[in-house]
A protein has these predicted regions:
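ATP/NTP-dependent adenylation/nucleotidyl-transfer catalytic domains that generate, transfer
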Residues: 1-137
Length: 137
């Protein structure tokens, strides 16, 4: 299991692999809209917010430990084409959903963390899945 990889990065990597390798399985994956764990009648960006905004909120709030107010300011500057009231709604929704789902991080399986996001001290102190020397083999 890979962890700490934003959806926008995953989609970029899949596009790159499809373009450079042409794997048919990747084309099938890209035909299906990306999305989080949602009810059957829900879809990702329509239900939440644009993934580029979601990834920014996630990085700023969880990674940089910014307050919701600061996240709102930065996201509004990052995406000037999105109305400020819409940004406020996105950030408010993100923070609420994030705090409601933090238990998923505790229950998640041991994973290879690609990014450096550290959500909680207890999980961060677990032994790493791989060590640096394993990457050189």
């Amino acid at each position: 299991v890979l962890a700490n990889v934003p959806k926008t990065v995953v989609m970029y990597l899949l596009d790159y692999l499809l373009e450079t390798r042409g794997y048919p399985g990747i084309a099938a994956v890209l035909k299906k809209p990306a999305g989080p764990e949602l009810a059957p009648n829900q879809s990702g960006e329509e239900e939440l917010m644009p993934f580029k905004v979601l990834d920014a909120c996630f990085y700023l709030f969880a990674g940089e430990k910014m307050t919701p107010e600061d996240v709102e300011i930065v996201v509004a500057e990052m995406f000037p084409d999105i109305a400020r009231k819409t940004v406020e709604g996105y950030v408010e929704k993100f923070v609420r959903l994030f705090l409601q789902s933090i238990y998923k991080w505790v229950q998640s399986p041991l994973s290879l963390h690609i990014g450096n996001l550290d959500l909680e001290r207890e999980r961060a102190l677990q032994l790493p899945v791989v060590t640096s020397s394993e990457w050189t083999r």
